[in-house]
């Protein structure tokens, strides 16, 4: 009896079973309910795995809802006032999720185009490669990207990477409303059947165009399971070296972008400690507007609801808690694909159909031809070396002039060299000719030449390397000509002061007697330009990328 009471107590503690939202309905009930569950169009839609674009073509027929016995499946939608809706025969395990959306911004940070493509493909929940020959074997020091390598967001990042050195910060908000998957052996769409019928039985160079035409229409894969809802995803491209010159890091800016996004959706108050810390950082760095207005090289994606990607709910003009709430309220009736599982198209064909293997080969060939290769044998610029952790990354020795990302730590930095000194018509002694030497000054440094004895027209072959200097604030470049006597009583014959500018310059200065000519060259450090190297200069990729093996390069 005690054991019975114990088990009964456990049973009473268990949560009540949730009734299944779907049931088998009679023909008359099926006719009375005309609306499908939201988002049925997503099931069985074609997808090109290299672009992650949905094809708007459907290899699977999701319009059929009556079974052969004239029954159907109807579902009670708790997110739409328990309305009764049809479920297509091709769909199984349909479930609505909670009616509320958690207001939380997830942030990811990557430093390469490959990383952006990898994050874009992270919404695929299964191994899309299964059954395909798509495992590239690159040479040493070559990185390969396949899934998402030609997606809009990856193309955006690649374009940026060819312009400058970037870090990429992504802020994302997701809401899941429904989930379902395809039934086993779903019915094929009549148009897809017709397209398959027109395919040649074998895949080779002469039939490739026919298979490419089908892939162009339907994609490489089809959606087999899906989470529906909404997503707002904003990728901000941050110029690494420009941030360094502003006294900031990509992590600092990314953290404050996330805080501003949290405030815009009502997930965090503008009186929070994090928000106040970012406001203080803005004051320190003289940022007059918000971080998202200051750093606004962005790619925006809005899925679900009545909005499109021109409506940035995190950083745009409509970025308010009220607009975000309105968008959430629209998702039960207008959901979009948040994440999904994929299978290659060829598995829809019967095992005995020879076109199944031909289509498998065609998809494999197409996907591999679209792979993007990054050749990490590309040389680093002078003064840089390959990172021990990533052979595709060039790094520098951390110093008071540059950081490990090879970014100058402040504006105005240049490498200064002075050489080719020639004096004429000097007069330093009454009896003999001049015993001349030079003193050259800049930025607190002094460099001397040796003495040229008994010569009123001396020249010096010294190459004076002042190293990295602050061109704008180092003071004048000063060249003094002296006549050597006993050291303590040497005579100053004249001084030449010039405010140095970037570039190659020949200088001719008059002295008390005669003149002095010399050359100086001031080369702005990488990422800097202008007369005194105060302006920012983007640094694109060095040279043309090497040819790739089977697809495009980054």
Swiss-Prot record:
Its cofactor is Ca(2+). The keyword Transmembrane applies. Keywords: Calcium, Cell membrane, Cytolysis, Disulfide bond, EGF-like domain, Endosome, Glycoprotein, Lysosome, Membrane, Metal-binding, Secreted, Signal, Transmembrane, Transmembrane beta strand. N-glycosylated. The keyword Lipoprotein does not apply. The record marks 213, 343 as: Important for oligomerization. Residues 1-20 form the signal peptide. Residues 26-374 form the MACPF domain. Ca(2+) 3 binds at residues 429, 435, 483-485. Ca(2+) 4 binds at residues 485, 489, 491. Detected in large granular lymphocytes and lymphokine-activated killer cells. Residues 395-513 form the C2 domain. Glycans are attached at residues 204, 400, 548. Ca(2+) 2 binds at residues 429, 432, 435, 454. One of its GO terms (biological process) is response to ethanol. One of its GO terms (molecular function) is pore-forming activity. Pore-forming protein that plays a key role in granzyme-mediated programmed cell death, and in defense against virus-infected or neoplastic cells. Can insert into the membrane of target cells in its calcium-bound form, oligomerize and form large pores. Promotes cytolysis and apoptosis of target cells by mediating the passage and uptake of cytotoxic granzymes. Facilitates the delivery of cationic cargo protein, while anionic or neural proteins are not delivered efficiently. Perforin pores allow the release of mature caspase-7 (CASP7) into the extracellular milieu. Belongs to the complement C6/C7/C8/C9 family. PANTHER family: PERFORIN-1. Monomer, as soluble protein. Homooligomer; homooligomerizes to form a pore-forming ring. This is Perforin-1. It comes from Rattus norvegicus.
């Amino acid at each position: 009896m005690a054991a019975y009471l114990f088990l009964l107590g456990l049973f009473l503690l268990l949560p009540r079973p949730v009734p299944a939202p779907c049931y088998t309905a009679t023909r008359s009930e099926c006719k009375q309910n005309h609306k499908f569950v939201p988002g049925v169009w997503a099931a069985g839609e074609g997808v090109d795995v290299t672009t992650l674009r949905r094809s708007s073509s459907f290899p699977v027929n999701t319009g059929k809802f009556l079974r052969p016995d004239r029954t159907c499946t109807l579902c009670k939608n708790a997110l739409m006032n328990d309305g009764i809706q049809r479920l297509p025969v091709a769909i199984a395990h349909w479930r609505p999720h909670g009616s509320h959306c958690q207001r939380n911004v997830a942030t990811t940070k990557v430093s390469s185009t490959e990383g952006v493509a990898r994050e874009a493909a992270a919404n695929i929940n299964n191994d899309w490669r299964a059954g395909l020959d798509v495992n590239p074997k690159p040479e040493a020091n070559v990185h390969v990207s396949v899934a998402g390598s030609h997606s809009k967001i990856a193309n955006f990042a690649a374009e940026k990477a060819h312009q400058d050195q970037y870090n990429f910060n992504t802020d994302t908000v997701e809401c899941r409303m429904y989930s379902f998957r395809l039934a086993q052996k779903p019915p094929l769409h009549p148009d897809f059947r017709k397209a398959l019928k027109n395919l040649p039985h074998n895949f080779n160079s002469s039939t490739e165009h026919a298979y490419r035409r089908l892939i162009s229409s339907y994609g490489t894969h089809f959606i087999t399971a899906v989470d529906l809802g909404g997503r707002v995803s904003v990728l901000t491209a941050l110029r690494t070296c420009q941030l360094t010159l502003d006294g900031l890091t990509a992590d600092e800016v990314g953290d404050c972008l996330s805080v501003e996004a949290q405030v815009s959706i009502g997930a965090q108050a503008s009186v929070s400690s994090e928000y106040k810390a970012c406001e203080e950082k803005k004051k320190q760095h003289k940022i007059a507007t918000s971080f998202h207005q200051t750093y606004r090289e962005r790619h925006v994606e809005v899925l679900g609801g009545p909005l499109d990607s021109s409506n940035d709910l995190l950083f745009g003009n409509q970025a308010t808690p009220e607009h975000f709430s309105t968008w959430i309220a629209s998702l039960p009736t207008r959901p979009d694909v948040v994440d999904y599982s994929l299978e290659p198209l060829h598995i829809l064909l019967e095992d005995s159909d020879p076109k199944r293997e031909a289509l498998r080969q065609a998809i494999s060939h197409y996907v591999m031809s679209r792979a993007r290769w990054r050749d990490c044998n590309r040389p680093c610029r002078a003064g840089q070396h390959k990172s021990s952790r990533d052979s595709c990354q060039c790094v520098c020795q951390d110093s008071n002039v540059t950081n490990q990302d090879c970014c100058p730590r402040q504006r105005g930095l240049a490498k200064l060299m002075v050489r080719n000194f020639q004096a004429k018509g000097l007069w330093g002694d009454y009896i003999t000719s001049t015993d001349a030497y030079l003193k050259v000054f800049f930025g607190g440094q002094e460099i001397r030449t040796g003495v040229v004895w008994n010569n009123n027209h001396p020249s010096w072959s010294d190459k004076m390397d002042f190293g990295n200097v602050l061109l704008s604030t180092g003071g004048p470049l000063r060249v003094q000509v002296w006549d050597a006597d006993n050291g303590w009583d040497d005579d100053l014959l004249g001084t030449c002061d010039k405010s140095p500018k970037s570039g190659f310059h020949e200088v001719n200065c008059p002295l008390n007697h005669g003149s002095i000519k010399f050359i100086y060259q001031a080369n702005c450090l990488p990422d800097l330009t202008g007369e005194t190297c105060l302006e920012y200069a983007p640094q694109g990729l060095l040279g043309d990328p090497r040819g790739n093996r089977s697809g495009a390069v980054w």
